[in-house]
Design a protein with these regions (language model features):
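Hydrophobic core residues within well-ordered beta-strands of beta-rich domains
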Residues: 1-3, 75, 93, 107
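Catalytic strand-loop segment that frames the active site of acyl-thioester-processing enzymes
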Residues: 1-38, 42-43
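Generic structural detector for well-ordered beta-strands
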Residues: 8, 20, 82, 127-129
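HotDog/MaoC-like acyl-thioester-processing domains
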Residues: 14, 86-133
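Residue-level signal for pocket-adjacent positions within structured domains
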Residues: 22-23, 27, 32, 70-71, ...
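Hydrophobic beta-strand-centered segment that forms part of the acyl-chain substrate-binding groove
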Residues: 52-96, 121
């Protein structure tokens, strides 16, 4: 599963990515019947895919050879997230990740997810690291 439709901005300091949650996504069936909302764990995964995985691959590519990057896997290690809104089926979200630190293949990013109307849905810090495949 991939929760990035498009990367809008990407440099050594930040990433901005967008995703539209499909109305027929399987996780809506039981969460919640008659009033589906996107589970928090899916929102964290969405932010991690942009703010840790995609951002991390970019940062690795600045420091390591293409072969080393190809043989690296980014694993999610830590999350501290506050939720302040909800994401409904069909909503488009924009996730921003800002670099807090990157060294020894370890990345920590400040992340934030917003709806198209600017409402902040969740924010916090996520961490991950590159490991050999």
């Amino acid at each position: 599963f991939r929760f990035i439709d498009e990367i809008i901005e990407l440099d050594s300091e930040h990433i901005v990515a967008q995703y539209v949650f499909p109305e027929d996504a399987d996780f809506y069936r039981g969460h919640f019947p008659g009033r589906p909302i996107t589970p928090g764990v899916i929102l964290i995964e969405t932010m991690a895919q942009a703010g840790v995985v995609a951002f991390g691959i970019y940062l690795y590519a600045l420091e390591f050879s293409a072969e080393e990057v190809e043989n690296m896997l980014t694993v999610f290690t830590d999350a501290s997230v506050d939720f302040s809104g909800q994401v409904l089926p069909g909503d488009r979200v924009t996730t921003t990740g800002r670099l807090k630190f990157f060294r020894r293949k370890k990345l920590k990013a400040e992340v934030e997810m917003r709806l198209d109307d600017g409402t902040v849905v969740c924010s916090g810090e996520l961490s991950g690291m590159g490991v050999p495949r």
